[in-house]
Regions:
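Helix N-cap motif at beta-to-alpha junctions
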Residues: 3-6, 120-125
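Extreme N-terminal "head/tail" segments of very large remodeling/mechanoenzyme assemblies
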Residues: 31-36, 55
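Short secondary-structure capping/junction motifs at helix and strand boundaries
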Residues: 8, 20-33
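Hydrophobic face of alpha-helices
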Residues: 9-12, 54, 69, 128
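Non-catalytic beta-strand/loop surface segments
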Residues: 1-7, 28, 41-47, 51, ...
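A common structural junction motif
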Residues: 17-26, 133-143
Length: 186
């Protein structure tokens, strides 16, 4: 956001370009840096996984609150996209190939599968015309089924017990979580 029209136009350009024309589609090394890659730090060392998203998700998967939140969504919404971790499970991230990533990106990161919101005191027609000319008209309309399914109600309550890791130095005192959840409507 910006109150300055020139800055706002520049921000629109930067964000639209980043989403619709990312360099990751041209350079596999970006996928390896951001997603995951093998790493060997010493010639006779252990081969490990590394990558920005891989490491971020390892951190997210180590937090008890995140573990609880993920399991709540998986149990409450098993038939929907909400059952899955949007950032990826670190154990599964390493199975993602560059080609699979590109296929997913090309299918879902398309203007036909987006909502663009503009808000504020501006010339909306001028902004929409600029977006169309600079970005949107370069794409053919696609029919993309990205409907989010509604989870059917369960006939019986579900009880689930899950466990999470703690380090040897962490206390187990007050380290138990209890969560009672319900879905209110669609």
């Amino acid at each position: 956001a910006s109150r300055n029209d020139k800055d706002f136009r520049n921000l629109m350009d930067v964000y639209l370009d980043a989403v619709l024309n990312p360099n990751i589609g041209k350079e596999k090394k970006i996928f390896m840096q951001e997603g995951w890659h093998y790493e060997l730090t010493e010639p006779d060392g252990e081969l490990t996984y590394n990558g920005v998203v891989y490491n971020e998700m390892k951190g997210a998967f180590s937090s008890p609150e995140s573990v609880l939140d993920r399991h709540i969504k998986a149990v409450m919404f098993p038939d929907t996209c909400y059952a899955f971790e949007s950032g990826g499970d670190p154990e599964e991230i390493t199975a993602l190939t560059y080609e699979d990533y590109l296929a997913f990106y090309n299918k879902y990161y398309h203007p036909s599968n987006s909502y663009i919101y503009l808000y504020g005191d501006m010339d909306f027609a001028e902004k929409l015309e600029w977006m169309d000319k600079e970005y949107l008209e370069k794409y053919d309309r696609q029919e993309i089924d990205s409907e989010i399914q509604i989870q059917k109600a369960f006939e019986e309550p579900i009880e689930k017990e899950i466990f999470y890791s703690v380090s040897e130095t962490e206390s187990l005192e007050n380290a138990t979580y209890l969560s009672v959840n319900t879905s209110a409507g669609n």
